[in-house]
Curated annotation (Swiss-Prot):
Monomer. Keywords: Iron, Metal-binding, Monooxygenase, Oxidoreductase, Phenylalanine catabolism. Disulfide bonds: none annotated. Its EC number is 1.14.16.1. PROSITE patterns: BH4_AAA_HYDROXYL_1, BH4_AAA_HYDROXYL_2. GO terms for molecular function: iron ion binding; phenylalanine 4-monooxygenase activity. Belongs to the biopterin-dependent aromatic amino acid hydroxylase family. Pathway: Amino-acid degradation; L-phenylalanine degradation; acetoacetate and fumarate from L-phenylalanine: step 1/6. Transmembrane segments: none annotated. This is Phenylalanine-4-hydroxylase. One of its GO terms (biological process) is L-phenylalanine catabolic process.
Length: 297
């Protein structure tokens, strides 16, 4: 999701999409399978194998089950059409290829109709450990396996429908924070301990370790209003992770009309990314070691 008012297409997106065209309305395009080089497939295999070695015991069971049920290719960039056969049969979702970041209204419309936009291109070998823009590994490996879980699938559809309303109400920054702290960087309590479900973590080797093992970040119980009023970081590891108890809790929290909540928060001073609020359910208070002093989003 892009929550910037000044939507700008990153240079790498422009370069990767030379010679391709997308639909002017929904930004989709046929997945250009012939564009993937042997180097691309090798890069995918490296990323996939690295995360699959690391994530057992760290990722939530629902993610690992989804990865297995979808039979995501380990040695090459997957064919979206083949994945869609299994995904649509499970929850009615499908993935659609897009050139990169897309405008918010288009993004919300896709989610509201059970279509998940996946950037078609892959990062380059020197970008294995960091890429600011989402690529096919982040979008597909990180996000798509959980779409086979019916409760999470319903949550993401509801989020898309809420996004259309939020944009009309000028409340997009609040809803963007909810996406960031759940879909991208969420943790979940399980009987076996705290686990990862956020795609931004699941697709990152270093943050998969940091979010659970480091003493630096705060880990705080899920609170909808708190999250929608909390800034975040896009350039470093997160200072705070919000922890849900179940995907049902996440879905139930988004069921009410958000319009009154937006009004309540309209004049509220947002919490900083590393702040601990008086009413927080603090599971782990971070020691703040290594935190960058630059501004939050």
């Amino acid at each position: 999701m892009n929550d910037r008012a000044d939507f700008v297409v990153p240079d790498i997106t422009t370069r990767k999409n030379v010679g391709l065209s997308h639909d002017a309305n929904d930004f989709t395009l046929p997945q250009p399978l012939d564009r993937y080089s042997a180097e691309d497939h090798a890069t995918w295999a490296t990323l996939y194998q690295r995360q699959c070695k690391l994530l057992p015991g760290r990722a939530c069971d629902e993610f690992m089950e989804g990865l297995e049920r979808l039979e995501v290719d380990a040695d090459r960039v997957p064919d979206f059409n083949k994945l869609n056969q299994k995904l649509m049969a499970a929850t009615g979702w499908k993935i659609v290829a897009v050139p990169g970041l897309i405008p918010d209204d288009v993004f919300f419309e896709h989610l509201a109709n059970r279509r998940f936009p996946v950037t078609w291109w892959l990062r380059e070998p020197h970008q294995l450990d960091y890429l600011q823009e989402p690529d096919v590994f982040h979008d597909l490996f990180g996000h798509v396996p959980l779409l086979i879980n019916p409760v999470f699938a319903d949550y993401l559809e509801a989020y898309g429908k809420g996004g259309v309303k939020a944009k009309a109400l000028g409340a997009l920054p609040m809803l963007a924070r909810l996406y960031w702290y759940t879909v991208e960087f969420g943790l979940i309590n399980t009987p076996a301990g705290m686990r990862i479900y956020g795609a931004g973590i699941l697709s990152s080797k270093s943050e998969s370790i940091y979010c659970l093992d480091s003493a630096s970040p705060n880990r705080v119980g899920f609170d909808l209003m708190r999250i929608m009023n909390t800034r975040y970081r896009i350039d470093t590891f997160q200072k705070t992770y919000f922890v849900i108890d179940s995907f049902k809790q996440l879905f139930d929290a988004t069921a009410p009309d958000f319009a009154p909540l937006y009004l309540q928060l309209a004049d509220a001073q947002p919490w900083g990314a590393g702040d601990v609020a008086p009413d927080d359910l603090v599971l782990n208070a971070g020691d703040r070691q290594g935190w960058a002093d630059t501004e939050d989003v």
